Amino acid sequence: KRGLIKDIERNYHVRIKKQVSFIRDWIFLCFFLGNDFLPHLKSLDIYHNGIHLLLSVYCFFIKKTKQYDNDYLILPNQDINMSLLRKIFNRLHKNEENYIIENIKHHKYKRNYLDDIPIRYCYKGWSNRYYDYYYKTHSFLYIDKIVENYFRTLIWTKEYYFKGCPCWKHYYKYKGILLSDMKE
């Protein structure tokens, strides 16, 4: 734990004042890179810069605060600081297409990335093609259902890791989603 915090302080030029709060946030941030319950966000890949991207943006915002309890992603009552999460998503979203293209270049010979060829990420309208390809629709109502299920599963996963399993019947039903849909 101390080694992780020292590395992050050194590499991201940030001073972590509340180590327990930071560790909770670190665990929570890693959910976006995928785990047994949630797929990774399409633009974030744990094998190619995903951790660095998340930490860079997270530390950018943490540096701007006094690091009071309510300045962290996971609040003392274990709720999610939606204001900070929204800021993180908005900042990451600005370069989402570039992150995806870099991930594809990095994984250009791996089957799951080759499946994405019809989406043509470099061309306008790629996010609609993404949903058309994987879900056969790009209806906002359907995408809202996907985002809602993602957030419910995100909260479920947070509860599972921090408090214990809230319900064994819950699961995430879809493929990874785009930051552009999460930022709202």
Predicted regions and their residues:
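Long, low-complexity, charge-dense
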Residues: 1-184
